[in-house]
């Protein structure tokens, strides 16, 4: 990490060098936002708007390309968590998960409900309760059939599958793979491959499990040992993985799942007093609890963290 001549902070190296823009955008200064306000999800729309899902009302915040708040909605998400952007034809939609209410809903960018997923048709779901954390879709624009996977990361530790109409199909728990999931926090269908694969952030087991789309185990991501993966997104040929709470960094994988860079690494913060929510731990150029990530057409990266009061950072590639 180094300071550039104009006092901006630079992180990374080689082709993965970025300028760090601290507080590129901020959540509204409200009592609820100051008391909690943890920023859990982020996506970027085709027209460059940055949408953030956070733990305060309204839960959805919409920022323009300069980081100014332009819209906000959503007063029914007390457990605002995973946020996924999908596209059907020319229309963009959001998938949102709420780990407190168990709601998994697809909405328009304006917040109108397009589809709600039913409770998983699985016995023994009273204790623990259903607490979904993330959604991924095998999108038709990438040659998929529209099937939906939901990670129950804070509940019973399953990954559930639905068809594109929202009909429950099946569940998996990891026992057919590397072992029972513990907090399967994030899920991601990698459609870039000839044979698409399902990546699962098996977070408390500190590993990433990879399956084919029929649920057959393929491998562990061996180069991401002792990981703390929260989520996944594609970035050109690379995959970006925010890691917390056992690590604090943004990891970049190449197409062969090899770690080629880590950004904002700050693993020592994970054992400091006040972790993970004390804002005194925040230091420009280093992450505390990176939870979700998104990119835009220019290659900029946006990272949100679950720290109290929220944190929205923009990384600008250095050409």
Q: Where in this protein do the model-derived segments appear?
A:
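Eukaryotic scaffold repeat domains enriched in small/polar residues
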Residues: 1-319
């Amino acid at each position: 990490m180094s300071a550039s001549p104009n006092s901006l902070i630079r992180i990374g190296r080689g082709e993965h060098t970025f300028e760090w823009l601290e507080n590129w955008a901020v959540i509204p200064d409200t009592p609820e936002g100051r008391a909690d306000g943890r920023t859990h999800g982020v996506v970027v729309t085709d027209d460059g708007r940055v949408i953030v899902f956070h733990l305060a009302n309204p839960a959805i915040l919409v920022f323009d390309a300069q980081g100014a708040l332009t819209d906000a909605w959503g007063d029914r998400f007390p457990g605002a968590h995973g946020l996924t952007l999908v596209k059907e034809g020319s229309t963009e939609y959001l998938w949102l998960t709420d780990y407190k209410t168990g709601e998994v809903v697809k909405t328009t960018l304006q917040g109108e409900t397009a589809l709600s997923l039913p409770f998983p048709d699985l016995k023994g779901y009273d204790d623990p309760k259903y607490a979904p954390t993330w959604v991924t879709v095998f999108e038709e624009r990438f040659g998929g059939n529209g099937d939906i996977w939901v990670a129950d990361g804070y509940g019973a530790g399953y990954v559930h599958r639905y068809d594109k109409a929202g009909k429950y199909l099946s569940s998996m728990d990891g026992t057919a793979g590397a072992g029972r999931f513990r907090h399967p926090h994030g899920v991601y269908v990698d459609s870039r491959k000839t044979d698409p694969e399902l990546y699962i952030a098996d977070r408390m087991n500190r590993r990433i499990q990879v399956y084919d789309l029929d649920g057959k185990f393929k491998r562990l991501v061996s180069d991401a040992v002792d990981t703390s993966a929260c989520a996944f997104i594609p970035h050109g040929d690379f995959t970006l993985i925010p890691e917390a709470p056992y690590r604090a960094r943004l990891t970049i994988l190449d197409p062969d799942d090899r770690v080629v860079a880590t950004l904002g690494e700050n693993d020592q913060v994970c054992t400091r007093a006040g972790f993970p929510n004390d804002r005194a731990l925040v230091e420009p150029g280093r992450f505390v609890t990176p939870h979700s990530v998104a990119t835009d057409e220019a290659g900029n990266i946006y990272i949100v963290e679950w720290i109290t009061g929220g944190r929205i950072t923009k990384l600008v590639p250095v050409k």
